[in-house]
Amino acid sequence: CEYNSLKVLKAFQKNNISDMHFNGTTGYGYGDIGRDTIERVFAEVLEAEDSLVRTQFISGTHALTVALFAYLRPGDIMLSISGKPYDTLDEVIGLVENDSSLKSYGVQYEQIELKDDDFDYEEIKNRVAKNDIKLIEIQRSRGYALRSSISLEKMEKVIKTIRAVNKDVIIMVDNCYGEFVDKYEPTSI
């Protein structure tokens, strides 16, 4: 707890965060110093390349939906390697009929189940080797499934396995309920 608190505090200090960064803006938000600076803080704390922090994202499912629709195009394949994602994504993916789902736009969905509370590394490696996957989704939290959350050690191992086969595939981690429970985040891997 103290380690992560200090990491956040240092990022606030490095970016000189003050009350002026939390003032409202008008118009389209061009030159919104508060938004831009807070996004730098989030990226630094999470050791990410960049971040998108908006009050307009009303839930984690909303943020995931925006990311999926940004990355995936008709003919692309999304692969979940931690089993089925949260039920809230069923309509987004197209597991439940929805005229606005990824499936309705021509995006295919596949999943690989966990094996004894761990990734099925061999199946993942074989599937990724076909070189037709656009995005791999990992749900760290157990969600509604009867399994343990995925440790960062297992996640690091599977990401290295994937990168050894395909360095360009997009790997998206749903880290819901996993923030700040370890010294580092999935974006640090």
What is each of the regions a protein language model found here?
Residues 21, 25, 52-55:
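Short glycine-rich or small-residue beta-strand-to-loop segments that form or flank ligand, phosphate
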Residues 8-9, 13, 18-21, 29-30, ...:
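Conserved PLP-enzyme active-site core in the AAT-like
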Residues 1-9:
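N-terminal amphipathic/basic leader segments beginning at the initiator methionine
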Residues 33-51, 63:
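Long amphipathic N-terminal alpha/beta scaffold segment
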